[in-house]
Curated annotation (Swiss-Prot):
The keyword DNA damage does not apply. It catalyses: glutarate + 2-oxoglutarate + O2 = (S)-2-hydroxyglutarate + succinate + CO2. It is an enzyme of class 1 (oxidoreductase). Keywords: Dioxygenase, Iron, Metal-binding, Oxidoreductase. SUPFAM superfamilies: Clavaminate synthase-like. Homotetramer. The gene is glaH. The keyword Nucleotidyltransferase does not apply. Acts as an alpha-ketoglutarate-dependent dioxygenase catalyzing hydroxylation of glutarate (GA) to L-2-hydroxyglutarate (L2HG). Functions in a L-lysine degradation pathway that proceeds via cadaverine, glutarate and L-2-hydroxyglutarate. This is Glutarate 2-hydroxylase. GO terms for biological process: L-lysine catabolic process. Signal peptide: none annotated. Its EC number is 1.14.11.64.
Length: 325
């Protein structure tokens, strides 16, 4: 694992609309920041990237960074340092991002372009085996027969980290709302690791560092298991996690009981945030010290929600940011 820490920059002061966006703490928590691109910035960005369809971003990976450069330039080159600082800051590490004028499923391709630009200002999104691309789009409906909780609407999808069953580093997760019809409930659930009341109890347990087997169901298109502990530490010795209840495979009674207790302790935390994410908005979180999940939906025969995700690793210039003890 490689949780990184940012050197402080003057990005703290970037809250002005003249930068092309606004930036402020969310109503849910000061750890979760809201970033909103102005209608002017959004329109200029879409106009400048119109020449590249989403397929071009799929086929030519360097274009993902180019669209990021365009977005950053429209924001006076103040966006990238702010994103990096926020994602690496242990006290924050989460963003709810909105672009004025993008709020309809008919703009799905524009949503993918915007999310791609933001993600590739902080790093690179990994190959997603479920979709065969660097991003995945999937639909939640009222009835589901899939082999994981990802698309099941009428139950809580428990708190977890992404990237637990792959070997690639998964520093960040991006989750975007593309469409929503006949929908009530289903808020995103977030828990910052430092706000979890039972962290010390489980982090100090002998099983916290034991390598465990993680195996994905067939729909994930991953053919081999991976092994790693549930807990690790960052460069400064602070706890980080790689955990998901559905895919960890305890080898014995001791591991099974400990994992069950851990799951219960996460789900009963009093500090879970419930965050509505309207169509066109997306969450971007540090995957190593934020856990995420989803609340249940209210049943409806025509329920439909479409989501897009990207997950990847941090990469940035060490002239401004570095790891340190």
């Amino acid at each position: 694992m490689n949780a990184l820490t940012a050197v402080k920059t003057n990005a703290d002061s970037v809250t002005r609309s003249d930068a092309g966006f606004t930036f402020a703490p969310s109503v849910q928590s000061p750890r979760l920041l809201e970033l909103t691109f102005s209608a002017k910035t959004t329109a200029q960005f879409l106009q400048q990237v119109e020449q590249w369809p989403v397929q071009a971003l799929e086929y030519k990976s360097f274009l993902r960074f180019k669209v990021g450069q365009i977005l950053d330039a429209l924001c006076g080159n103040q966006l990238q340092p702010l994103l990096i600082k926020t994602l690496l800051d242990r006290a924050e590490g989460a963003l709810l991002i909105n672009a004025e004028g993008i709020d309809n499923v008919e703009q799905a391709d524009e949503m993918v372009k915007l999310a791609t630009a933001v993600a590739h200002l902080i790093g690179r999104s990994n190959y997603d085996a479920m979709s065969g691309q660097y991003y995945a789009r999937f639909v939640v409906k009222n009835v589901d027969n899939s082999d994981s909780y990802l698309r099941q609407p009428h139950r809580v999808m428990e708190l977890h980290n992404d990237g637990t069953y792959v070997e690639e580093v998964t520093d960040y997760v991006l989750m975007m709302k593309i469409d929503e019809q006949n929908m009530a409930g289903g808020n995103s659930l977030l828990l910052h690791l430092d706000d979890w009341e039972h962290l010390e109890r489980f982090f100090s347990h002998p099983l916290a560092r034991r390598s465990m087997r993680f195996a994905a169901p067939p729909s994930k298109n991953v053919s081999h298991d991976v092994y790693h502990p549930v807990f690790d530490v960052d460069q400064q010795g602070r706890p980080v996690m790689r955990y998901i209840d559905q895919f960890v495979q305890p080898k014995d009674f001791e591991e099974g009981v400990w994992l069950s207790d851990l799951s219960d302790a996460l789900e009963t935390s009093k500090n879970i945030l419930s965050v509505p994410v309207p169509v066109g908005k997306f969450l971007l979180i540090n995957n190593l010290f934020w856990l995420h999940g989803r609340d249940r939906f209210t049943p409806h025969p025509d329920l439909r929600r479409e989501l897009m995700r990207q997950r990847g690793y941090f990469a940035y210039s060490t002239r401004c940011y570095q790891t340190h003890q």
